[in-house]
């Protein structure tokens, strides 16, 4: 069943189904378990935090997300070249259905050679050439999403703030401002939306 149900009848970017706030490093919301969304996640920063592999009882280990102005996917691997210094890298069958605008990186391992992309991605595979027999090459391919959701919902790199947000800051403390300079106060959030719980 559903523990909490939030819904708004508003249709603008100022409309919020569920709103929570917390001061300082406190959590405005915390989920013990999986978290899913069928829409777009918007955030100021992101990371993972796990029990530290070398000291799991006493420490955490955190890494930040890698961000991009594009909806990018990153794929990488290592391939061993054949006797003529060539290799074919096979990608998943859905690769070209999901990605476009490919970018490539190649790095030789253990020795140097003028390796290059001999054939770009066609039928979900690409070719490497210019190396030595049995040489290992690390490869990386980056693609931009071209699936229907990504095409229909591009993320604007720059955008104007909404009417209620104009002249205010998401993180006023970072700019040396008081919390009153925040985008919307909790009171305003409550007044503009109807919240329901079930």
Mark where each language-model region is.
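C-terminal intramolecular chaperone/autoprocessing and neck/assembly modules of extracellular spikes
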Residues: 30-197
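Surface-exposed, glycine- and small/polar-enriched segments that build interaction surfaces at terminal
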Residues: 1-45
